Amino acid sequence: MADGMYHEKQYLMHCAVHTLNNLFQEPWATAALMEDIAKELFDREAAMREESGMGRMWVNPYKSLVPQVGYYDINVLLEALKLKACHVSLHAVFNPKEPHAVSTAFEGFNAKPGTGVRGIVINRVSKSLLGGLYTSHHFYAIIPSTKTIWYVVDSKNPGPEIIGTTSELALHLGMEARENQGHVFVVSDGEGDV
């Protein structure tokens, strides 16, 4: 475990909140913030649907049906990143035709100080319920130390866990994409779109 590293533990389905706080190493994101962002996204989409003559949405797809429970959509997390002047600079996902593409893409990954890379967010399948009819997803952060050693900072774990060097990071990301249908989001400073 990494001494002095900020680490939030899982509460309800707030893994997106914990991931943001673990990524930025401070407790700035809250369930109230994420609820507000989810409502704003819902209102924007409802207005666009109304303008285009599409039917009304009755349920907010950006969060849990139950208020304050969490289970926030990736779009809520992406909007929250903007509040910290950050964006996703790379998004990688498993491709069965190229099973090692994610690992290969990250083999020469450079996240040394000065590159603007804050860390990585993983969104992976967490549970498959009802015989695979329903799956839930879980977010967690991966952050570099000042010595370019990478750590998993997952709210479901008792504390931060070391991954190792960039080559070990590439293997970890490839495994997450391959085995857990993980989406890999590289978070960088500044504005931009993937």
Regions picked out by a protein language model, each given a short descriptive name:
Residues E50-G132, S145:
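Conserved active-site-adjacent core of cysteine acyl-enzyme catalytic domains
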Residues N21, Q25-T30, D43, A47, ...:
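Short amphipathic alpha-helical interaction elements and helix-loop-helix interfaces
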Residues L12, L20-N22, N95, V125-K127, ...:
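Conserved beta-strand elements of beta-rich interaction domains across eukaryotes
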Residues M13, V17-N21, N75, E79, ...:
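Amphipathic alpha-helical interface elements that mediate macromolecular binding in regulatory proteins
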Residues I149-V194:
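Noncatalytic regulatory segments and standalone regulatory/sensor domains
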Residues M1-Q68, V76, A80:
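Active-site nucleophile-adjacent alpha helix/oxyanion-hole segment immediately C-terminal to the catalytic cysteine
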Residues G4-Y6, F106-K112, L129-L133, Y140-A141, ...:
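Beta-strand elements of modular eukaryotic interaction domains
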Residues L129-S145, W150-S155:
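Canonical SH2 domain fold
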